[in-house]
A protein has these predicted regions:
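Nucleotide-activated sugar donor-binding and catalytic core shared by glycosyltransferases
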Residues: 1-93, 102-190
Length: 190
């Protein structure tokens, strides 16, 4: 940021951080948040995934799980412990995990006997947007998905000990859990 002549931000929190870092605010422009702008623009176009009807799952009666970070996927002992805890903590509700690639392969293998976790193919934007905006809660390692959850007022657990999206924490919709499996179990009991 210190090397740039012009700075473009997504909100007042980013402006505040830049100000604290000594940026010249006359060269800082708040242009909006493209993630949220895209969400707003497409909300009426969201498409209910057929999986929900096939499994007779009602809106607000399931969780969504996304996992993509290599560090999380490479720690197989933690990953298995986390998945087992999730499976045992959702009171019979489904956890829908739209995954791809290595994440899908690893988690599918680990979840073969876990009846509450449904590992499915990754979804397009409109289906995934519907899925996350109608979930009971979201478990993710993605800051962008946590940000969308905050916009949709959906409770979110972030499987990390930091986030670039501080507003998700200050609004109260997102909890940072890092690698603490026991916290996940407590949070899903809400």
């Amino acid at each position: 940021d210190g090397l740039s002549d012009l700075l473009f931000t997504a909100g007042t929190m980013a402006n505040s951080i830049l100000s604290k870092e000594g940026a010249e605010l006359q060269n800082t422009y708040m242009v909006g948040n493209i993630i949220i702008d895209t969400l707003r623009h497409n909300y009426s176009r969201f498409s209910r995934p057929t999986l929900l009807d096939d499994k007779k799952i009602k809106d607000g009666d399931y969780y969504v799980l996304t996992v993509n970070r290599k560090a999380l996927l490479s720690d197989e002992a933690y990953l298995l412990s986390m998945l087992t805890t999730l499976n045992n903590s959702v009171n019979g509700k489904y956890i829908i995990a739209p995954l791809r690639g290595v994440a899908k392969e690893k988690i599918s293998n680990m979840c073969q006997r876990m009846t509450n976790i449904l590992v499915v193919d990754s979804m397009g934007y409109l289906e995934f947007g519907y899925l996350t905006s109608h979930a009971k809660g979201i478990i993710t390692d993605s800051g962008n998905i946590a940000e969308e959850a905050t916009f949709n007022n959906i409770p979110c657990i972030t499987l990390n000990d930091y986030t670039e999206h501080i507003e998700t924490i200050t609004k109260g919709t997102n909890l940072l859990f890092g690698y603490y499996v026991e916290k996940i179990e407590m949070a899903l009991g809400y």
